[in-house]
UniProtKB/Swiss-Prot annotation:
Name the record gives this protein: FK506-binding protein 2
Similarity annotation: Belongs to the FKBP-type PPIase family. FKBP2 subfamily.
Phylogenetic placement of the source organism: Eukaryota, Fungi, Dikarya, Ascomycota, Saccharomycotina
UniProt keyword Endoplasmic reticulum, yes or no: yes
Keyword Kinase in record: no
Domain PPIase FKBP-type: 45-134
Encoding gene per record: FPR2
Species this chain originates from: Candida glabrata (strain ATCC 2001 / BCRC 20586 / JCM 3761 / NBRC 0622 / NRRL Y-65 / CBS 138) (Yeast)
Keywords: Endoplasmic reticulum, Isomerase, Rotamase, Signal
Record GO biological process: chaperone-mediated protein folding
Listed GO MF terms: peptidyl-prolyl cis-trans isomerase activity
Chief location bin: endoplasmic reticulum
Subcellular localization: Endoplasmic reticulum
Length: 136
């Protein structure tokens, strides 16, 4: 019985660890693409297109959304064009996958905040969907 409990505990730790990065980024896969249908995963160097909605974790206030503009953001993954939490959270996503990224301040805008909309030291939540990958 004790060994079964230990196995269950170990499994739960592995599941939790697989969904967070060691440096504080946490994410939840909200739309998983089956392995058999995941033909392309986002890798550094890829040009990716992402739909997103960003909100403040403390109160859920939405500060930006590409869905409102009906235009995904495009950027080169790994080139430092977006916050570090996005770089880490989008790497490895399958085309069509959706995730919720829970990004601590040190992987977002830190003590400076951003544009009068994101306060200093804010934890951010982003619902993201990988809509395109262009690989050279």
């Amino acid at each position: 019985m004790l060994s079964q409990i230990w196995i269950l505990f170990t499994f739960m730790v592995c599941v939790i660890a697989s969904k967070s990065k060691s440096d504080g980024l946490k994410f939840e896969i909200t739309k998983k693409i089956p392995i058999s249908k995941c033909k392309l995963k986002a890798l550094p160097g890829d040009m990716v297109s992402v739909h997103y909605t960003g909100s403040l974790a403390e109160n859920g206030k939405v500060f930006d959304s590409s869905l409102r503009r009906n235009e995904p953001i495009q950027f080169k993954l790994g080139a430092g064009q977006v916050i570090a939490g996005w770089e880490q959270g989008i790497t490895g996503m399958c085309l069509g996958e959706k995730r919720t990224l829970h990004i601590p301040p040190e992987l977002a805008y830190g003590s400076r905040g951003a544009g009068g909309v994101i306060p200093p030291n804010a934890v951010l939540d982003f619902d993201v969907e990988l809509v395109d990958i262009a690989r050279n």
